[in-house]
Amino acid sequence: MRAQVLKQYDDHLTAPSWVDLENVPDPKIEKASDVIVRIGGAGVCRTDLHIIEGVWREATDADRTLLPLIMGHENAGWIEDVGSEVEGLKKGDPVIVHPKITGGTCLACRRGHDMHGENGMFPGVDCNGGYAEALKTSVRNIVKLPQTLVPKEVAAYS
């Protein structure tokens, strides 16, 4: 699949080559709760520029192993594939993707505050995101949309 890949940080957003369009492996179902979303739209915000600038480098990439990274944390699209435990979703369903993947078992998650979950990943920030043709996430992060909503028009709301 094609993806927009961040290759190096650029403190001043001056280099034209900090992001490249590349062919990368398609995401694969690995866990029973995994969902693959075919991306229909991905938002761009100041967070993305902060990632390029390396503002959060010490928090998300202290050991300097994160790059290359597929950015994009505001995503919507259509279900492409689901793991064996996923119910109520089928290929082609329009969805919006909650930006943080969490386990759902820590106290914060059980209280409904999963943005503060202990064992989370943030696609597009500290693992591959949605500036690609497809994104792997968890069923916990999927919100099914009505057929009347177009993913590219709602992606930035995720």
Report residues per predicted region:
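Glycine-rich beta-strand-centered segment in the early N-terminal region that forms part
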Residues: 25-43, 57-107, 141-149
